[in-house]
Structure formats: C-alpha cells, structure tokens
Curated annotation (Swiss-Prot):
Disulfide bonds: none annotated. Belongs to the ATPase gamma chain family. The keyword Ion transport applies. GO terms for biological process: proton motive force-driven plasma membrane ATP synthesis. The keyword Transferase does not apply. This is ATP synthase gamma chain.
Length: 289
C-alpha cells in the first residue's frame, strides 16, 4: 500500500492535471460558440447562391451542366473532414467508422473509391486504412478559410471533369447540439436531387439579365457553391470538435475530482491508522515503565 507521502504526491499531480482539463474545457466552450457563429454567418451565402443556381437552371432548361447530371457510377470520391487534434472523445473514430461502412457498400458493388482528406487525423487514419488519396489539407486552425480548402475540392472536381470520378461525397460531423455530434455522408456532385420545397424545385416568376451569359455564370456558381458546401462542413466539424472536446474535458475534470476524493479518503484512513498506532505505542511504553 502507498505511504502518506506518495498519496500526497499523487493528489498534487491530479490536481495539477485537473486545472489543465478545466482550462481546456473553458477554452473549448468559447471556441465552440465562435464556430457556431461562423456556421450561422455562412448559411445565408450558400442559401442565396442555391437560389440563383435554381433560377439559372429554370431559365435555361436546355443547358445541362455536368455537375447536375447523373451518370453510371464506376468510381466515387470522398472528401473526408476530420480534426487536426485529438482529445475530442470518439468524434473522429465515429466519423471513420461511417466512412468505412459507406466505402464497404460501394466496393461490394465493384465501385472504386478515392479520397481527398481534410485534417491531420484523417491523414493518419488513411495511412493505415489504405486507398488512393488525391489530396490532403491539414493545419487549418480553429477559423479555417475558404481559400485553404480550394485545393482539396478542386482536385476532386478535376477528377470528375475528366471522367475519373462519377460521384463525390462529403463526409463530416454534423452539429446536433453541444452534447451530440452525428457523422454524415452528403452527396456533393452531381448535386443531390432536390427535396420537396427546395429552392431547386421552386418556380420563379421573374427573370434577370445576366452578364456574362447564364451558362458561363452557372459554371462558376456551381464551383463556388460546392466549395461553400465543403466550407460549411469544415466549419460545422470545428464546432463538433470543440463541443466534443468540451464534453471530454468536463468528464476528465469530474473524474479527476472523484479520484482526488478517493485518494483523500485513503490518505485519511492511513493517517488515522498511523496516529492510532503511535498512541498504542506510547500507551504500551508507559505501561512497561
């Protein structure tokens, strides 16, 4: 059994660690709120762009853009969004399980897969998992910019344009609330079929005069829209990372507190036993005299 000095040292060490985990919890909570604000700020941009795309498509029904037309699927690409750092509970593990499950279903249909990776954790995972990686982006920080992501997006779009990919998916974590993050797989290209009530299904009674031509404008807008979807996925993943880290650090702080209580109880019992023994020795010595 540990002596009193060893227990005191353990308690001091755990208290020091507890201060760190509590500080990390508070920092993660602050970063999560900022990431949520960026999520809210980015949505109107993507929504308005989708409305303009919908109007262009309806105004030019004879023009079928390649990013909006399904074709036989032989090869698919995945843009996988993970975090750069750990200490986020099972956030990345659950995401990779989702990817592996989806990839397995594709391979069972003899469909080849390729990847573009965002985040150091994804890079590390796919080194062991294998698969053809077309590009990787890491060290995005807590406030990633759209410019940092264009490389990973463009390499996949280039492969699609060349016919090397027939479909592109975005895999990231969805922010449900501060306690819950849900990995999800979304079809990026071709644009997923519009749901009822979606802007792509809406009929507009007005028209614009476009400069440049509508087809040329649609080409650029679709690329920007796809980039914005990936950006939103990355920003949402940052919010998920920080919320998962906040929860993990709170659990670590609480566990440290419980461990300190348990060690303090052991310390008190040992100290009580030592005092009792000393008293017994004194009484025994006095009786001998």
């Amino acid at each position: 059994m540990a002596n009193l000095k060893e227990i005191r040292a353990k308690v001091a060490s755990i208290k020091s660690t507890q201060k760190i985990t509590r500080a990390m919890q508070m920092v993660a909570a602050s970063k999560m709120r900022r990431a949520q604000e960026r999520m809210a700020q980015g949505r109107p941009y993507a929504d308005n762009m989708r409305r303009v795309i919908a109007h262009l498509v309806q105004a030019n029904p004879e023009y079928k853009h390649r990013y909006m037309v399904d074709r036989p699927v032989k090869r698919v690409g995945y843009i996988v969004v993970s975090s750069d750092r750990g200490l986020a509970g099972g956030l990345n593990i659950n995401l990779f399980k989702k990817v592996v499950q989806h990839v397995k279903a594709q391979r069972e249909q003899s469909i080849e897969v390729e990847f573009a990776l965002i985040g150091q954790k994804a890079v590390s995972f796919f080194k062991n998992y294998g698969g053809k990686v077309l590009g990787a982006t890491t060290q995005l920080g807590d406030a990633p910019s759209l410019e940092q992501l264009t490389g990973s997006v463009q390499v996949m779009l280039d492969a699609f344009d060349k016919g090397e990919l027939d479909r592109i998916y975005l895999v990231s974590n969805g922010f449900v609330n501060a306690m819950t993050q849900q990995p999800k797989v979304e079809q990026l290209v071709p644009l997923a079929p519009a749901a009822e009530g979606d802007d792509l299904n809406r009929t507009y009674g007005w028209d614009y005069i476009y400069e440049p031509e509508a087809e040329q404008l649609l080409n650029g807008l679709l690329v920007r829209y796809i980039e914005s979807m990936v950006y939103q996925g990355v920003i949402e993943n940052v919010a998920c990372e920080q919320s998962a880290r906040m929860v993990a650090m709170k659990a670590a702080t609480d566990n440290a507190g419980q461990l300190i209580k348990d060690l303090q109880l052991i310390y008190n019992k040992l100290r009580q036993a030592a005092i009792t023994q000393e008293i017994s020795e004194i009484v025994g010595g006095a009786a001998a005299v």
